[in-house]
Structure formats: structure tokens, C-alpha cells
Amino acid sequence: MIQLVYNKQKGIFMDLEFIFNHVISGYLPIMVLLILYFIILKSFGNRPSKGHIILTFIFSFYLVGVLSATGVCLKANFSPRFSLLPFIDMIRGPKDAVLNVILFLPLGIFLPLLYEQYNSLSKVFLLGFLFSLSIEIIQMFGFGTTDINDLITNTFGAVLGYGVYELLRRLFSDSLLEKFQTKGKYSLYEPVILWTITILIMLTIQLYIYDILFASKMSGEIQKW
């Protein structure tokens, strides 16, 4: 579930800034690791296209954003909350369902666009499901509510994103899209490794970077509220 706290008096989502600050805190170490990763690939004679490299940096920024928006950027406090009844909350609160679909829609576009191995609806479905499941498991540790409806809507968002990708394939030539794509067996594992490393960074290093860069500023803003 996307973590948003609304201030009725000011009529704004203050924590959009809060989320963005966590995105920046998490993206800085990810960016350094990606630079090292592509340097190592080049040293071994494996040179991805410039389009793939640039889009991978954008994709990693998106992944950090997903984790920040779902609360996987805060200090752990084990207090599990569960919502295991499917579809009921979707009917009661369709806004959350729509936001969850939108949140994972880019994933269904990025995966086949970046990795040849994910030019498959079944693989996008599986990875969308696993990515969402990992978030729901982590949310057991005080980062939000573990909700089966989030799992359903996130996975549907990834599948819908794959449909958008197929539409793009019809609009643009394959040669243009292939400029962003990497091939080979390792392309099957790269997004999984990137997602895992991003989670680990968001739960560890990111917290310290956030405290250094933004904690004092945000605590002052909270006191004003």
C-alpha cells in the first residue's frame, strides 16, 4: 500500500517530500554500485548499449521510488498487520487499488524493454508477483499493512504494463527498442539482483544517508504541523 499522510488543514501531501528525500537517499548508493557494475562488465568485454545503461539508471530510480512509496525506507518495528480478504478493500477503497496498479505499471514496461529474457507475459507476471510479494513480506515489520489486495493490484499493474510495451512494439521498430535491451542468460537474473540489492540498501545504508541529509530538516517541518 502506498504510504501517504494527508494534512487536512494545509490541504497538501507533505510526505511527498518525505518520500522523495528517501528516494534520493537510497538512489545515491545504488547509482555508485551501478557505475561500478557497468565498469566491471566493460572490463570483461561485455559492453551494454548506451541506451541500456541510461535506462537501467532510470529503472533503478523507479525501483527505489516504489520501495519508498510503500514505506520500505523506514526503521523496522515488528508490528504485523494483515488484510487477507481479496477484493473487499478494492471495492471499499478503489483509489488505493488504482494507485497500486499505476505503481507497478512501469515495471511491466521496463522489464521487456531492458531484458530480452522478459519479453514474455508469463515472466513479467511472475516477477511482478514476486516483487510485490517481497514488499508485502517486508511490510510485516512495521512498514505498513500486508494486504493481499496490494499483491493482486500490483501484479495486474505489471501485466498491464507489459500490454503497454506490446503496444510500443507496434508503434516503433524493433531495432529502436533493441537499443535498450540486453541479451543473454544473465539478463534473466539482473533485475532480480538489482531489486534485491535495492531492498537491502533501502533497509540499511539509505537510513544513515537520510539521517545525514534530511532528518533535521524534516523533524523541523513535522514540528510545524
Language model segments and positions:
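Non-cytosolic membrane-interface motifs at loop->transmembrane helix junctions
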Residues: 86, 145-156
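Bulky hydrophobic segments
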Residues: 6-137, 141-142, 166-225
